[in-house]
Amino acid sequence: MGKRKSSKPPPKKVVQKLPKHFDCLFCAHSQSVDCILDRELGKGVAKCRVCNASYETPIHELSDAIDVYSDWIDACESIR
């Protein structure tokens, strides 16, 4: 009698990393906006390296760079 065929363990799910650099809303350069999170002061800053446009917003411990950038987009849309 033979041995049972052992099954392979299921493959691990690939977790995509969140971006840290974004496209500028004003000068349209790609990957030119850097988001800096200062958790001690509780503020996040998104700043373009090309046109120096910047946006500052309050953050909390669960905030990430994408949250600061999306707040900037929402603020620009509310003005228009």
Curated annotation (Swiss-Prot):
Where does the signal peptide begin and end? Answer: none
**Annotated Gene Ontology MF terms?**
RNA polymerase II complex binding; zinc ion binding
Residues annotated for Zn(2+) binding in this entry = 24, 27, 48, 51
Report any one BP term from Gene Ontology: transcription elongation by RNA polymerase II
The GO cellular component terms are: nucleus; transcription elongation factor complex
Q: Which UniProt keywords apply?
A: Metal-binding, Nucleus, Transcription, Transcription regulation, Zinc, Zinc-finger
Q: Which domain of life is it from?
A: Eukaryota
Is the keyword Metal-binding in the record? yes
Membrane-spanning residues: none
Q: Which family does it belong to?
A: Belongs to the ELOF1 family.
Write down the PANTHER family for this protein, in alphabetical order: TRANSCRIPTION ELONGATION FACTOR 1 HOMOLOG
Protein name, as recorded: Transcription elongation factor 1 homolog
* Species whose genome carries this gene: Dictyostelium discoideum
